[in-house]
Regions:
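Long amphipathic N-terminal alpha/beta scaffold segment
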Residues: 57-103, 110
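Structural motif of enzymes handling amino- and sulfur-group chemistry
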Residues: 313, 321, 329-378, 393, ...
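Glycine-rich phosphate-binding segment of PLP-dependent enzymes
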Residues: 43, 89-90, 101-126
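Short, flexible, solvent-exposed loop/turn segments with mixed acidic/basic and small polar residues
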Residues: 82-87, 191, 294-297, 348, ...
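Conserved PLP-enzyme active-site core in the AAT-like
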Residues: 80, 128-344
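Long amphipathic alpha-helical segments
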Residues: 1-76
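Flexible, glycine/charged-enriched surface loops at secondary-structure junctions
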Residues: 54-58, 83-84, 236, 255-256, ...
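Conserved C-terminal alpha-helix-loop-beta "cap" of PLP-dependent enzymes
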Residues: 368-424
Length: 424
């Protein structure tokens, strides 16, 4: 058989459309989508013929059932949502590639109400006048953090950009070289800072920065001092850094705002739950930081957002910055964030109901109970395999608490019928 004979075996679009399975498909999917899938599959077979050698053409065959199945699957793949629910079996709690923090089930009803109806997003129900979308969040954030004011944008990088564009545009911002982190995907804090301010003044070295380094970087053009919490890595050993309190004591910096990018945004002192202490938003403000920025979807356990808290005089300027309009959050994020924040009014409720906090503070006893439930489900599959429970370690993830190792339990499964395990 020659290649031209193989090409002749390829069915026409019309002949495929007459297939009963394809007719059934037309009842549930758009015709144009099915036609596209038919053409894609036929073209794939055509390319397959082109690639094979002449002496292999004899073995080439087109099985109609397989062809139809490919068309059906291709159509379904095109129609289904690209973003899908997955099981996180990585051992990383806040996995950036898997969507970071899970929202609490308590947030679900709030989201449904707001998503499927109208809302008072920018309407004041008390006076019947236009309101601000930020009013829904400012009071609860002020209560939880002790900040004078707050504004929310769509992520923490946007928060840093807005802060610097408002406070330090056309001026200089001092930052330690040891705090110029890369936040993932080749995005560096230095690049974001340069977009927002006129000039970045790097001081000190990677492992050591002294107060004199900050003083040497100070000039008449200095508009702010930036502190970046290195939440996604630690430099250990021969190191030194300058704390907020020491910076606040310097006469030169008396009228210079200190900005701190906390990144992960912790509201609870996790050392009370047997974990390493991680600086909280409240602690930073108590130390005298003028502006703090942090993420909503990391340790806070809410939706993606960049939260800015601090002195009212600076926050008011940010709210008037034209960038705020470009970076603003929508009603869905506001609803999810408010519902998440309200759980923090009772710390025990937050630990119990916010999935991220619940997972990282979970005791070994609780894990063992969950492991027992999982084992029962595995055994129900009647897998002919050896199953062994072992202790293991996981991580917080999301650029948070890089040195913290969380004890967990895993099942090792090996031998026969491993295909069934995929259904767990």
């Amino acid at each position: 058989m020659k290649k031209r004979e193989a090409f002749a075996k390829l069915p026409s679009v019309d002949s495929i459309l007459s297939n009963n399975n394809i007719k059934n498909l037309l009842d549930n999917y758009p015709r144009e989508l099915i036609l596209e899938s038919i053409r894609d599959v036929i073209e794939s077979k055509r390319q397959e013929i082109i690639r094979i050698k002449e002496d292999e053409v004899e073995t080439f065959d087109i099985e109609e059932d397989i062809l139809i199945d490919d068309i059906i699957q291709s159509t379904k793949n095109k129609f289904q949502l690209s973003i899908q629910k997955v099981i996180n079996a990585t051992g990383i709690v806040i996995h950036t590639n898997l969507g970071r923090s899970k929202l609490s089930p308590n947030v679900q009803s709030e989201l449904i109400d707001i998503a499927f109806g109208y809302s008072n997003l920018e309407y004041n129900l008390e006076n019947g006048k236009r309101g601000s979308r930020y009013d829904h969040l400012v009071q609860i954030i002020k209560r939880l953090t002790g900040a004078e004011d707050a504004v929310i944008v769509n992520n923490n990088a946007a928060a840093v950009l807005l802060v610097l564009n408002t406070i330090a545009k056309d001026g200089e911002v001092i930052v330690s070289r040891g705090e110029l982190v890369e936040v993932g995907g080749s995005f560096r804090i230095s690049s974001i800072m340069e977009l927002g301010s006129g000039k970045l003044v790097e001081v000190g070295s990677t492992n050591k920065t002294h107060i004199e380094d900050y003083k040497s970087g100070f000039s008449e053009e200095t508009k702010a001092i930036m502190k970046v919490h290195t939440s996604n890595y630690r430099i250990l050993g021969f190191t030194e850094s300058v704390g907020i309190e020491e910076l606040k004591q310097q006469e030169e910096f008396k009228n210079i705002p200190i900005i701190e990018d906390l990144g992960s945004g912790v509201f609870v002192d996790l050392s009370k739950y047997g974990l390493t202490y991680e600086p909280t938003v409240i602690d930073s403000l108590k130390k005298g930081v003028d502006i703090v920025t942090f993420s909503g979807d990391k340790m806070l356990g809410g939706p993606q957002a960049g939260i800015i808290v601090g002195k009212k005089e600076y926050i008011e300027k940010m709210k008037k910055n034209q960038l705020t309009r470009a970076l603003r959050v929508d009603k869905m994020k506001i609803a999810a964030l408010e519902a998440t924040l309200r759980m923090y009014l009772d710390e025990k409720e937050a630990i119990r109901n916010i999935p991220t906090l619940k997972m990282i503070t979970c005791s070994l006893k609780e894990l063992d109970e969950k492991a027992g439930i999982l084992l029962n489900k595995i055994q129900e599959l009647n897998i002919d395999a050896d199953i062994q429970k072992e202790k293991n370690v996981s991580q917080v993830g999301g650029g948070s608490m890089p040195l913290e190792k969380l004890i967990n339990l895993v099942y090792l499964i090996w031998k026969k019928d491993l295909e069934k395990v995929k259904r767990i």
